[in-house]
Amino acid sequence: MALVEFLMETLDGLKGTDIVHFDVRGKSSITDNMIICTGTSSRQVSAMADNLITECKKAGFETFGEEGKNTADWIVVDLGQAIVHIMQRDAREMYQLEKLWA
């Protein structure tokens, strides 16, 4: 299974909402794909990130790091070819990443 499809399905299974994918080839020098999803609370955002990393490792996808665990308003998981943003609704509305990458 391709990485992006795997990530989208896994996030959906983890009860992420408003999951969107952007192909950012030519727009970003750090990755080819951005995925953004929403969690309902800091606990859910943190758990989604932890479980996503676990599932990626089980499936053989390498993770290169994560940022934002301290507050869990917005956690970024770096998988090289894709970067996943797991955000609480307030953070997602404030930063409006969709407008940046659309």
UniProtKB/Swiss-Prot annotation:
GO biological process: cytosolic ribosome assembly; negative regulation of ribosome biogenesis; negative regulation of translation
PANTHER family assigned to the protein according to its UniProt record, in alphabetical order: IOJAP SUPERFAMILY ORTHOLOG, MITOCHONDRIAL ASSEMBLY OF RIBOSOMAL LARGE SUBUNIT PROTEIN 1
Highest taxon listed in the record's lineage: Bacteria
The protein, known as: Ribosomal silencing factor RsfS
Family: Belongs to the Iojap/RsfS family.
Molecular function GO terms recorded: ribosomal large subunit binding
Record text on subunit structure and interactions: Interacts with ribosomal protein uL14 (rplN).
Naturally occurring in which organism (per UniProt): Haemophilus influenzae (strain ATCC 51907 / DSM 11121 / KW20 / Rd)
Main location: cytoplasm
One GO CC annotation: cytoplasm
Localization annotation: Cytoplasm
Record-linked SUPFAM superfamilies: Nucleotidyltransferase
Function text: Functions as a ribosomal silencing factor. Interacts with ribosomal protein uL14 (rplN), blocking formation of intersubunit bridge B8. Prevents association of the 30S and 50S ribosomal subunits and the formation of functional ribosomes, thus repressing translation.
